[in-house]
Every structure is written in C-alpha cells, then in structure tokens.
C-alpha cells in the first residue's frame, strides 16, 4: 500500500459513503479502510449492511459504522449522518432499471442534490466524489470508429431518448438509466458553479465493473452478479442487450474514488474507469482459459467491438500515485470475482 503524500484528507479522517451496501460502494469502503480512513456508510436499513459490517469489524475494528438513511430524497436526509465527515462519496442511486423516467431520473438528481446541500452546510467537508458512469458520456456504439471521449463529453442524447422512447422499446430502461447518470452529474456541476461551496467536487465514471462480491446476499444484482450467473451457465436475455463496452476492476474503481477524495492534484475532474474493451465472448473465452475443466455456454452471436477511446490520463495518474502501475486485467478481475463466489 503506497503512502499518500500531502493527502487532502489526513489518515484517520471520516468519510461518508452513501449506499455503502452496493457492489461498487463496498469496494470504495474497502479501499478507504485499507488506507487508514474511517467510514460511515449509509443504507436504507441496517440489515442491508449487516454482513458487510461484520466483515469490516473483523478486518478494521472500530473503523466502520452503519448509518440508516431510509429516503435519500427526504429534505435533510443526510444532515445528521454527514456530521464530522471530511469527505463524501455519494454512490447511492436508483438501480432498478425501470423504464419510467420519473422513477429513476428524478430521484437520482434529487438524491445527489440532497447530498451536496448537506456537504455545503458542513464546514468539515473538503472533498465530495460523485459516482457517475461512462453512460453519462456515451452508450456504447459497436463498430463505430472515431469516437473519442474526454471530460467534456456528455450523453445529452440519453435525456431525449429517456423521455420520448415508447415503453415497449427493450432498450428504454438503458436510456433511462443513462439519463439518470447524465442529469444527476450535470446537476452536481451546476450546483458547484452556482453555489461555489467550500469543498472540491470530482466525479468517477465507471464502466462495467468486475471484482469480488463481498456480500452475495445483497450484491447478486450487480454487474459482477450478472457475470457470475453466466459463469454458472445462466444465459439471461438481458446479456444480449448489453453491447460490447469497457470493463474495469472493482479494485481500481475503489482506488479511483480514493484518489479523487485525497489527492491534491485531482480537482474538478471527471475520471473514467475504463481499463479495456470486452464482450460476452471475451468473458466466455476467459472463463474457459482460467477454468478448463468446467463447461460454459456457447458463444453469443457476433456482437461487434467497442472502438471508442477514452481519455484515461487522470485515471492512470491516480492509480500511479496510489502505487498501481496501471489497470488490473480482465483475467485478474474475473479471478477476483469467481474466487469470491466459489471459496
């Protein structure tokens, strides 16, 4: 573990992590605890964090505490739980994949603004990290060349499609999810520009995240949960709807959040979590290579390739500053996933 020089948040500082029971959030918590920070994690009920609380009590005694926020849209929802925090990682969001705009986009915006307002009213907060998504920049477009995505890229198309596509369209839920991430992040940057609070905002934009599932009881519906279902021979129709795209290790996503919270040179950045491209046949080929004695489903029909390119210079700077030479490979990420589920 690399020592963090001139960290914005001194070791031992308290960080509030919203939606801490989620798959990505649990990896953010893990990296914060591993690097000497204290974490207060929120969930809609204490039971949703019970297994993770036991894990972290055993590994990092006295450094993780559970806080219940039943409704992130309620006025003042975070006002109490944020007290004493030096940093905030706002990861809680709506992941129902409903195709109804008002059920997904509206609460995503409202929850984000609630957390920002609470931070603005809390003098101890120095950094605020928003978990966005690469879909706030673009939904993958297979076999299309010449797409380059940087910190100025926004998926404004998703907002229109989320409002206008018929509910019968099988892709509508994906566009609604993309709109929720796009609009919530845009609202966050607008809040910062208009209110000029005392803290710094950074955003982390993961793509398909693969890694250890810390709590199978609550995280089976995550991206890694879907991949594990394929490992176990279940071919969900939803998989065929997911285009080729980029993957990223959950470990690396945890580190990117950590870097956005503590590294002094990372300010007002949109940081992509995009290690390399994959499709389901890539995953199946990796399964067969790593576990040759196991039988897996047949390959999917040709899905094409994600030919887009991302500006990952800030991401790689963070990983290097935290002692990582670069991205974890898809093989490492899948080993992390399968090992956690078969141990």
UniProtKB/Swiss-Prot annotation:
Gene3D superfamilies hit by this protein = NAD(P)-binding Rossmann-like Domain
Temperature sensitivity of activity: Optimum temperature is 40 degrees Celsius.
Q: Which Pfam families match?
A: Epimerase
List the EC numbers from the record: 1.1.1.2
Per UniProt, activity regulation is:
Inhibited by quercetin and diphenylhydantoin.
Residues annotated as binding NADP(+) are: 177
Identify its protein family. Answer: Belongs to the NAD(P)-dependent epimerase/dehydratase family. Dihydroflavonol-4-reductase subfamily.
Describe its partners and assembly state.
Monomer.
Specify the protein name.
Aldehyde reductase 2
